[in-house]
Amino acid sequence: MKLYILMGTHLAEISQCINHLVKSTKDLGEVKIHHPAEYEWASASQDQVSLQPYDPDTVLWVFDPDRPATAFIVVDPKTDLIGQLEHLADNLAKCQIEPLKVVTCVDCERTEQSAKLRAWYEACIYYSDVVLLGNRQNAGKSFVREYQKHFERLCYPCLFLLLKGAGNPTQPGELLTSGPRRISQMFDLPESTPDEPLPGMVIEA
């Protein structure tokens, strides 16, 4: 099972981003797009793709780690962010699944205008491997440059990329390949520990 988590407020752009990834990538297998139920969602219009609307207040995330499939989970921007991520991380740990990538799609136009939204996105980016800078048409170029530099000065390891047009990622391969770059370890599975002492191991009572 390949699983990806996406966060952001411009859901039309996120939808286009996922559809672009599905159409341009082979070997994804069965694809399920899990999105907040209150939002209409544009499908990629491909046979192997199914939409899975969910209620963030009642959803229980259950996946088969051995299934040859791909899941995209879009976090609800109107529901408590940290609560959703903690619930998701707990459910995924029970399934023994780590997301291959956690992605934040930044609405640059709205973020430039709102300090509150900038704080929300900063929280998202703390958990992210990749940050996609989107909806830049009406955002100041200096703001977009300074926004990225802000996180570089803080030594955030996440990768910053651009969304072009309606939401097409410039480097789709970077979104789908494994390789965590996130600061948070919330989604990391704990390392397995042996049930019995290894040979030569001394256990003190």
Each PLM stretch: what is its role?
Residues 1-43:
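Glycine-rich P-loop/Walker A and Walker A-like loops and their local beta1-loop-alpha1 context
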Residues 13-15, 38-45, 81-83, 111-112, ...:
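Short, charged/polar "capping" segments at the starts of alpha-helices
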Residues 9-10, 47-53, 107-114:
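Short, flexible loop segments at the rims of nucleotide/cofactor-binding pockets, characterized by
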Residues 76-155, 159-161:
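Phosphate/Mg2+-binding loops and adjacent switch elements
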Residues 30-83:
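Conserved nucleotide-sensing/catalytic segment adjacent to the nucleotide-binding pocket
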Residues 140-205:
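C-terminal accessory "lid"/substrate-recognition subdomains
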Residues 6-11, 34-39, 73-79, 106-109, ...:
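Structural motif
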Residues 7, 14-15, 27, 35, ...:
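P-loop NTP-binding module
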